[in-house]
C-alpha cells in the first residue's frame, strides 16, 4: 500500500476508533483494489468512474456476495473521500457508482436456554473460568462490541451505579448498565484472578499472562466455551450482541432504549433486531387479540 492508504487506515484507527477487525477488512479491501490496479495497468490518482464500473464487474466475477461487494465499494468510496480532503485535484470515482443492494438477513441469536448452558460451562471457579465468565457476562449483559470490551479499564466499572462506561464508534462514550450476575462475576474476577492482581496496567480483561486481551483472544475464549458446551455449535462476539438486543425486545424493551444501549446512531440499525421468536409472537397475540381465546380458555 502507498503512504496515502496507510495514512487513511491510521485515521480510521486513531480518529474514528475502528476495531482491529474492521481495520483488517479495510486493509484487505485496499490490497485487493491495488492488485486490480496493477493487473489492469491503472493508476490510483487517475482512476475514473469507468474504471470503477469495471472494478465492480471484476468483484462480481469472483463470485462474491453482494454484502462483500457492497463493503468493498464503500471502503474505496470512503478512502477517496479522505484523499479529497488532502488533495483538491482528486475526484472520487466511486461517488456515482450504484451501490449493490445488500442481502437481507435476520441476525443470529441464542435462546435463553442456550445462554444458560454457556454460563453453566464456566460456572466452576477455576482461574480460567473466572476470566471466561466475566467476558461472557459483560458481552451478554451489556451488548457491547468486542472492540469496546477489550478497551475497558478497571476505572470504567462503576459498582455504585452498576454499569460500565465504554468508548464506542466515533470515540463516543456511553454508559451501559449491568445486572447482579454480571456484577458478581466482575467482583469475583477482580478478587481471585491472580494475573490482574500483579499486572502493571489498568485494562480489565486480561489473557492468562496478565496482558490486555485482544479481539482475537476474545474470539478464541468464546470458541473454547462453545467446544465445552453441549447443544451449542456456533458463537461469535456479535452473536452475543444480537442476543442481548433480541432478549430485551422480547421482554418488552422499547426500540429507543435498545438503540441507546447498543450505541447505534440510527434507529434503523437497531430495527434489524425486532425479529422475535415464534413463541413470543404467539404469546403477544394470545394476550392482545380479542378473539384469540374462547371464553372457557380465559
Curated annotation (Swiss-Prot):
Keywords: Cell cycle, Cell division, Chromosome partition, Cytoplasm, DNA integration, DNA recombination, DNA-binding
Name of a matching Pfam family: Phage_int_SAM_1
CDD domains the record matches: INT_XerDC_C (cd00798)
Subcellular location per the Swiss-Prot or TrEMBL entry: Cytoplasm
Domain of life: Bacteria
HAMAP family, alphabetized: Recomb_XerC_XerD (MF_01808)
Family: Belongs to the 'phage' integrase family. XerC subfamily.
Protein name: Tyrosine recombinase XerC
Amino acid at each position: 500500500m502507498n503512504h496515502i492508504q496507510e495514512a487513511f487506515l491510521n485515521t480510521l484507527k486513531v480518529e474514528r476508533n475502528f476495531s482491529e477487525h474492521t481495520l483488517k477488512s479495510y486493509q484487505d479491501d485496499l490490497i485487493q483494489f491495488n492488485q486490480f490496479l496493477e493487473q489492469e495497468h491503472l493508476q490510483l490518482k487517475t482512476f475514473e468512474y469507468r474504471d470503477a464500473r469495471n472494478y465492480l464487474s471484476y468483484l462480481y466475477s469472483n463470485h462474491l456476495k453482494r454484502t462483500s461487494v457492497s463493503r468493498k465499494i464503500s471502503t474505496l468510496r470512503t478512502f477517496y473521500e479522505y484523499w479529497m480532503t488532502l488533495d483538491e485535484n482528486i475526484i472520487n470515482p466511486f461517488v456515482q457508482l450504484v451501490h449493490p443492494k445488500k442481502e437481507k438477513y435476520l441476525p443470529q441469536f441464542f435462546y435463553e436456554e442456550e445462554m444458560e448452558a454457556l454460563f453453566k460451562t464456566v460456572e466452576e471457579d477455576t482461574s480460567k473460568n473466572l476470566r471466561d465468565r466475566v467476558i461472557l457476562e459483560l458481552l451478554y449483559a451489556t451488548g457491547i462490541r468486542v472492540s469496546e470490551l477489550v478497551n475497558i479499564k478497571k476505572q470504567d466499572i462503576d459498582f455504585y451505579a452498576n454499569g460500565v462506561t465504554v468508548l464506542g464508534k466515533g470515540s463516543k462514550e456511553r454508559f451501559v448498565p449491568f445486572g447482579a450476575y454480571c456484577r458478581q462475576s466482575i467482583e469475583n474476577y477482580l478478587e481471585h484472578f491472580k494475573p490482574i492482581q500483579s499486572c502493571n496496567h489498568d485494562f480489565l480483561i486480561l489473557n492468562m499472562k496478565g496482558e490486555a486481551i485482544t479481539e482475537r483472544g476474545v474470539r478464541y475464549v468464546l470458541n473454547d466455551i462453545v467446544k465445552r458446551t453441549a447443544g451449542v455449535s456456533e458463537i461469535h462476539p456479535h452473536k452475543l450482541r444480537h442476543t442481548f438486543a433480541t432478549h430485551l425486545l422480547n421482554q418488552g424493551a422499547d426500540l429507543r432504549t435498545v438503540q441507546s444501549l447498543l450505541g447505534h446512531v440510527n434507529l434503523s440499525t437497531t430495527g434489524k433486531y425486532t425479529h422475535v421468536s415464534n413463541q413470543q409472537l404467539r404469546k403477544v397475540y394470545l394476550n392482545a387479540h380479542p378473539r384469540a381465546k374462547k371464553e372457557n380458555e380465559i
